[in-house]
């Protein structure tokens, strides 16, 4: 298609397109997603361990003319960006890249993160996705980022709101409160606060919200389960103690001495079998 430029996998050099307007030249650099292993072989004299090392090496190899306006299109996770449940990130932030590596660029158009946001400075920006892809994005307003490059150093950034046909939302309350809502075809996560499970809750809620996508409960039982799963000293407790806590959480009462003996005997048998 005319005007569409596609950059393939990194092959040692960053492709660029040179355009001109009334203010002079604009150089658009196309940097595909890279990993340390992707670029290491192209820079044998450099120590490339992290994603930051990889991007630094690539940026240092680019022959930028600082008299021109330079735009970088990049698909990396930049330190400080706020991710949602939809994106995959490396444990411990190993895939993070410092936004300061892009200081020579007049504008950096970032992809990968779904939430529209700037990082470090207004000219380093994720435009975000046009639609919401997980309920962690329910409170996120989507938009199109419009960037006007005027003379060198003069960048104007505006956001044009995107209003979806069906929004993605979360609502919370008792079952009777949820059923009293106005009918809507939005994509919903419904959180019920009733202490007892509602039979066929999803089918009933579909009468008001036909596009319900997820149903959860938030009550004393589920909160107790969350506390149990997150117990900080679980590693310091015996299997019998952990089982006892789980039993009490589920049954609302402690085990009897007879039940404890049965559990102890079963655990002993399991350990002896190993």
Predicted regions and their residues:
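Conserved catalytic scaffold of divalent metal-dependent phosphoesterases
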Residues: 2-93
